[in-house]
């Protein structure tokens, strides 16, 4: 994931910072506990495409 892109994208729910999870290929919003998929290198920043983080992921 391009670090320049991470500097300008934001969570569509709260406008918070997103963090790239390289293992799962997702952008994670820790404030909302949501993970947005990255498909073919393109972030899918749609709330209905996000998945809730598990309890373990929240505390990682």
Curated annotation (Swiss-Prot):
InterPro entries: Trm112-like. GO terms for cellular component: cytosol. HAMAP family: UPF0434. Belongs to the UPF0434 family. PANTHER family: PROTEIN PREY, MITOCHONDRIAL, ZGC:162634. This is UPF0434 protein YE1549. The lineage of its organism: Bacteria, Pseudomonadati, Pseudomonadota, Gammaproteobacteria, Enterobacterales.
